[in-house]
């Protein structure tokens, strides 16, 4: 997973939140023949074949936390991370003194059940006594197949710091595919396997509950799995495996297309171009339909979104959104953003400015 910079381009995480594995209970997986059996079943379900042996490491909770911490550390200090820190503070998502990397570590510490690292082509899965739940192995095997056939860190699936919305949409395709295969794999297990291995699966659940994560960040953490799963199932229902594989070569451009698969199936129109006010921005990226929904907590606004950008400069934060219902979007943003935010709209354009000194900004232009 790589929400807002979480291990972007280095690994894909299967996250366990609230004590629930996203795909449900699964059976035991050790080394050797059993793992090969899981790989063969996943290949059958996904319609892809591995081109090389897969390296699978089963870790205990302490070792898994160490792997995740090292991967998070690789991204520290980047300009993108600093830009997100500033933006999320100004938007009121982060509290004074908080840092995005700190929140991410807290949210993910002890909550990761498995990950695949494209750089090393290694799968790490959490297990008890040397055994990992089969569903976790299956999920990460899908990522290995995706990487072998479509390259998770290059081309259309590569990280895009200046297009956060497009990057999140592509991530939803990746995680939705893995979650879909994972759930179908679990459904293929016998009732005896499911019941008999429930205790082992619960024993392998990550521990160390994290502190409460801000709703915006929590939703973006789950979005690739939940919305991505619905998106992938819609593609498979329309065009089967061929359409899904085509989507990996032409990922959804926006989270609006993930939230509404009909948009993607109708040709996946690009977002409406939106320009920020003239000035120098040390950080600028797209602000998408999912960002709008996560920030306001109002799911219906996703269908209003047409395009958007956000930038942070010396003056503070500027945001421009093209929408179908500017008055409704502006009203929702007024409810969600700090009181210091100046929010106006003109026609279909919604304009937001939040000053670095938290002072109210007057006379914001929205032309």
Label for each model-derived stretch:
Residues 28-99:
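A metal-dependent hydrolase signature that marks the N-terminal structural subdomain at the beginning
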Residues 80-118, 276-317, 329-333:
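Short, compositionally biased low-complexity segments enriched in polar/charged residues
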Residues 148-153, 157-201:
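Post-HExxH zinc-binding segment in Zn-dependent metallohydrolases
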Residues 208-315:
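Pan-zinc metallopeptidase signature
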Residues 42, 135-152, 178-179:
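Active-site recognition of the HExxH zinc-binding catalytic motif
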Residues 123-138, 169:
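Short pre-active-site segment immediately N-terminal to the catalytic Zn-binding motif
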Residues 308-367:
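C-terminal soluble interaction/assembly domains
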Residues 52-71, 159-165, 195-205, 251-252:
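Acidic helix-start/capping segments at beta-turn-to-alpha-helix junctions
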């Amino acid at each position: 997973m790589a929400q807002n910079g979480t291990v972007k381009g280095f690994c894909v995480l299967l996250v366990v939140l609230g004590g629930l594995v996203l795909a449900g209970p699964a059976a035991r997986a050790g080394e050797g023949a059993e793992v090969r059996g899981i790989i063969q079943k996943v290949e059958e379900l996904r319609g892809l074949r591995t081109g090389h042996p897969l390296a699978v490491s089963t870790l205990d909770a302490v070792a898994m936390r160490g792997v995740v911490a090292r991967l998070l550390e690789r991204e520290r200090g980047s300009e993108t991370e600093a830009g997100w820190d500033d933006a999320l503070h100004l938007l009121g998502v982060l509290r004074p003194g908080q840092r995005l990397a700190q929140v991410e570590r807290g949210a993910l510490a002890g909550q990761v059940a498995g990950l695949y690292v494209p750089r090393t082509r290694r799968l790490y899965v959490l297990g008890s006594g040397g055994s990992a739940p089969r569903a976790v192995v299956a999920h990460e095997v899908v990522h290995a197949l995706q990487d072998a056939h479509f390259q998770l860190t290059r081309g259309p699936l590569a990280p895009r710091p200046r297009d956060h919305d497009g990057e999140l949409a592509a991530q939803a395709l990746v995680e939705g595919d893995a979650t879909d295969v994972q759930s179908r794999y679990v459904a293929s297990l016998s009732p005896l396997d499911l019941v008999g291995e429930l205790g082992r699966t619960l024993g392998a659940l990550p521990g160390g509950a994290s502190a409460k994560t801000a709703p915006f960040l929590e939703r973006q953490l789950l979005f690739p799995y939940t919305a991505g799963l619905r998106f992938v199932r819609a593609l498979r229902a329309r065009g089967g495996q061929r359409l899904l594989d085509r989507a990996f070569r032409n990922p959804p451009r926006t989270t609006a297309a993930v939230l509404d698969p009909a948009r993607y199936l109708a040709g996946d129109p690009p977002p409406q171009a939106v320009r920020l006010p003239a000035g120098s921005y040390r950080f600028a990226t797209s602000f998408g339909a999912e960002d709008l929904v996560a920030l306001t907590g109002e799911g219906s606004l996703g269908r209003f979104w047409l395009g958007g950008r956000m930038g942070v400069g010396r003056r503070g934060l500027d945001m421009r959104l093209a929408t179908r219902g500017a008055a409704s979007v502006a009203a929702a943003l007024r409810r969600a953003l700090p009181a210091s935010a100046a929010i106006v709209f003109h026609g279909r354009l919604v304009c937001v400015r939040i000053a670095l000194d938290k002072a109210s900004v007057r006379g914001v232009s929205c032309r």
